Amino acid sequence: MDLKGTTILAVKDDEGVSMAGDGQVTLGQAIVMKHGARKVRRIYKDRIIAGFAGSTADAFTLFERFEAKLEEFGGNLLRASVEMAKDWRKDKFLRRLEAMLLVSDGTTLLMLSGTGDVIEPDDGVAAIGSGGPYALAAARALQRHTALSAQEIVTKAMAIAGELCVFTNDHLTVENARRA
């Protein structure tokens, strides 16, 4: 799966989850087509935050399907995520989609992939996309060695990822989901 062109980072703290995504859209390996794309958004009655890495068209298809699962299961994030991952893995059309999702309701943070993975990180930090490893490392260091809030951590860690990953820029979208 080719995930070049974006970085999505989410960090959970006592107040909830903050998620950030950069805005760069890259055509192939060399051309930046857009600087301010919105890859993190609020879904399901603005109660769930979700971010995507991968093909934009594929991600929108997955957002639609995921939101339908949330409707079907009354906003139950874990149940909707598991059912979405099952469909994603089994369905011939969905299996070809190249994207990953980070989703949160403020209490639970999950990473979903087309291989059927539904992963809740042990430390409350998750990242996807080409700059994901850089953002993840920076966020974990900031989480362990500072008293910054989740929102401050995602903002600073994404800045570091943007310095290291040519497919990640500093035009961030940040969304917060507070614990219920």
From Swiss-Prot:
Domain of life: Bacteria
Family to which the UniProt record says this protein belongs: Belongs to the peptidase T1B family. HslV subfamily.
Gene: hslV
Record carries keyword Cytoplasm: yes
GO CC annotations on file: HslUV protease complex; proteasome core complex
Keyword Metal-binding: yes
Function statement: Protease subunit of a proteasome-like degradation complex believed to be a general protein degrading machinery.
GO biological process: proteolysis involved in protein catabolic process
Cellular localisation: Cytoplasm
Assembly behavior: A double ring-shaped homohexamer of HslV is capped on each side by a ring-shaped HslU homohexamer. The assembly of the HslU/HslV complex is dependent on binding of ATP.
PROSITE patterns reported for this sequence: PROTEASOME_BETA_2 (PS51476)
InterPro entries assigned to the protein according to its UniProt record, in alphabetical order: ATP-dep_Prtase_HsIV_su, Ntn_hydrolases_N, Proteasome_sua/b, Proteasome_suB-type
Residues that hold Na(+) according to the record: G162, C165, T168
Pfam family of the protein (one): Proteasome
The species this protein was found in: Oleidesulfovibrio alaskensis (strain ATCC BAA-1058 / DSM 17464 / G20)
Enzyme Commission numbers on file: 3.4.25.2
Name of protein: ATP-dependent protease subunit HslV
GO molecular function: metal ion binding; threonine-type endopeptidase activity
UniProt catalytic activity: ATP-dependent cleavage of peptide bonds with broad specificity
Keywords, alphabetical: Allosteric enzyme, Cytoplasm, Hydrolase, Metal-binding, Protease, Sodium, Threonine protease
Residues at the catalytic site: T6
Record comment: activity regulation: Allosterically activated by HslU binding.
